Amino acid sequence: MTENKVESNSYLTFKVGEEEFGAHVSQVLNILEMTKITEVPKTPDYMKGVINLRGTVLPIIDTRLKFGLPETEYTSNTCIVVMDLDFNGDTVHIGAIVDEVLSVVEIEKGQIEPPPSIGNRYKSDFIHGMAKVEENFVMLLDMQQILSNTELSEISGKAENQPV
């Protein structure tokens, strides 16, 4: 007797601007309320600064700026999603400011479509795919690809040298 096993994955869904995005829960470490961010000089615009997370310096990026949207206007829903990324075999934690965290959803592999090759304003190399969740399309992000190794190196290096 064969078993039909459907492979599904859990994604944390959140809003950036008017769009819904999802990040695989294996890459999400924590969700934090907005807090005071210490600015770091001579960093890219999308790097808002650093915060102290349990005695560790955590670099914070503004996903709106990284995606080419206007800077985030903070509301009561704005929060920081702490991501767990691999950088040359080392684990690097990055905080990503999002407009609102929505929910955790299960998405079967068969529901994931490739990202469109035209008409997408976001770089397709960090969009893993698209899935319809209820009535909305969710862009599934490969958080590992949002920042290049060079950007990760620059951000984590400057963050480590910053007092918080």
Briefly describe each language-model feature range.
Residues 1-164:
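An acidic, low-aromatic, low-complexity terminal/linker signal
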